Amino acid sequence: MWKSILAIALGAALGALLRWFLGLKLNSLLPSIPPGTLLANLVGGYAIGAAIAYFAQAPGIAPEWRLLIITGFCGGLTTFSTFSAEVVTLLQEGRLGWAAGAIATHVGGSLLMTLLGLFSMNWMLGR
């Protein structure tokens, strides 16, 4: 149990630190759809897709690795709450087009990146 807790905590801390760094460095570049938040969600989508594909072909790997990467790191990196707050701010400002664009970009982009992660990992593994 403690190994699982430590794996999740370590992964989450690393993912959250990366998300914070991306926001700090990139979000001021385009406040309407902050690129740091978007990049965190896209990278997290790709990483979780690749991890799912990898762990599916390697069932003997200790479950703590899956917890560290998928539950911890990807969970700490991706951010539905920040994305939601940014969209609500756009809606409150009456910027409906930007809000719709942000929703489409984050949700569609994250789904596409997850599929890309799955397909690319399967390709690299020869599956």
From Swiss-Prot:
Pfam family, one: CRCB
Keyword Ion transport among UniProt keywords: yes
Record-given protein name: Fluoride-specific ion channel FluC
Gene: fluC
GO molecular function: fluoride channel activity; metal ion binding
One GO process term, biological-process aspect: cellular detoxification of fluoride
Cellular localization per UniProt: Cell inner membrane
Catalytic activity as recorded in UniProt: fluoride(in) = fluoride(out)
Annotated HAMAP family: FluC
Cell division recorded as keyword: no
